[in-house]
């Protein structure tokens, strides 16, 4: 807990924690080749898990829609909204600003890598929750994925196979991608 407060989750995962004269590794990065089977086995032993509706406080019954863990440590929180049920990504942002107290351990600065608010169209992210002052950045691909062809603009391209925000699940929140983000 002390190391997480001082260094943040990314640094603790990268460097481990010292206990007396030993370092306890909490994460193993993907080795640069598959020839080192010992390191590959360690990397494959990392446990990425997801909890839906995580009750994060002993003071109330508030829940997070989705929380991602690495080897038991929370690394990402998500508020997921569905415009068909009347809520958009902006409701998720307001939920973080109004209902998620940064005094709670999971929301304190650098305790998690990132907090996402997402719906079927858009994704926004913040790394520092601070009530109404919390600033969210767009985490979208842009129209035409940034290629110099019209139409230009914010948002996400149409996905013929499903949701416009599919890239978050299929490209970012994968074991390989998250491991690279943490390691680098």
Language-model regions: role of each:
Residues 1-184:
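ATP-dependent helicase/translocase motor core
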